[in-house]
């Protein structure tokens, strides 16, 4: 079992990573140790994940003397919305839950982001715990306190920075994850190697097969390394005013794909993969990376069974309309996270539109 701490002074919290953590109530017991007897806990999940894991969590909570209840939400990116947020608020208000309630987000990135935002808003903030069940949420969205819902005009535009009290990652959950969802998570894993750790990227090139075979040692190492990197970055820049923006490699292009094609038609990680190729090509056109480095990025995404092409139905204008709504835009200027090598990246603001267009069009011919 691996244990990592996100160091944020009085808001620091642990990340526990290992196989079979759901079977051991000790992890929840440690987190809830300072709570009241008969502590009220709400587990929020979706209709796909709840039948697999909710009963285990509820049983553990009951063993600990908690008064636990379950809210099941619809499954899918399209439900990461204000309508579903209101459904959560109605459940909490109708249940007369007080400010000392603990909320557990049991699911993937949609559940984690939505439940985190609801926890930030309910009575101006209640404690919540992340129990991510997809690879993407385990390596990225459950760590760092970004919470949000989508708006038809943009992804994650309504949200808050709100840290969990703990993150519990059981790698056994990945055995029930469809391969397409697993691959979407691998896109975020690869991202960490590109922006921060060239040696980790090298390791991924050699070990993708082990990850897809759900090799426990390889999975634990990869997830822990991603969480270590994210914890280091978040500790330096919690509110994304500097280095944390590098974690958005591929996301400016990728969010445009998700918004234009409809949330859920491309999985988030699929859009990030395509967006990362466009960002890498932008870097190549600007002379920031070599042809060999560009090829390595494209090849690892292909090896991971991820899309590297630009969606045929999206024009340059479609991309720019959405990208100019990106949260990194400052004073009307588009800023892109661009790799400057394998293991490094920068936020760069002065990319000419003709280069961006060339990068987008490059993906049409791959």
Curated annotation (Swiss-Prot):
Taxonomic lineage from the root: Bacteria, Pseudomonadati, Pseudomonadota, Gammaproteobacteria, Vibrionales
Its recorded name reads: 3-dehydroquinate synthase
What reaction does this enzyme carry out catalytically?
A: 7-phospho-2-dehydro-3-deoxy-D-arabino-heptonate = 3-dehydroquinate + phosphate
SS bonds (residue pairs): none
Q: Where in the cell is it found?
A: Cytoplasm
Q: What is its main location?
A: cytoplasm
State its role. Catalyzes the conversion of 3-deoxy-D-arabino-heptulosonate 7-phosphate (DAHP) to dehydroquinate (DHQ).
- What are the alphabetically sorted keywords of the record? Amino-acid biosynthesis, Aromatic amino acid biosynthesis, Cobalt, Cytoplasm, Lyase, Metal-binding, NAD, Nucleotide-binding, Zinc
State which Enzyme Commission number(s) the record gives.
Answer: 4.2.3.4
Q: Which residues bind Zn(2+)?
A: 188, 251, 268
**How many cofactor units bind, and how?**
Binds 1 divalent metal cation per subunit. Can use either Co(2+) or Zn(2+).
What this protein needs as a cofactor is:
Co(2+); Zn(2+); NAD(+)
A Pfam family cross-referenced in the UniProt record is DHQ_synthase
Note whether Cell membrane occurs among the keywords: no
Kindly report, in one word, the top-level EC class recorded for this enzyme: lyase
Q: Name one GO molecular function term.
A: metal ion binding
What's any GO biological process attached to this entry?
A: chorismate biosynthetic process
Q: Record's Gene3D superfamilies? A: 3.40.50.1970, Dehydroquinate synthase-like - alpha domain
Which GO cellular component does the record give, naming just one? cytoplasm
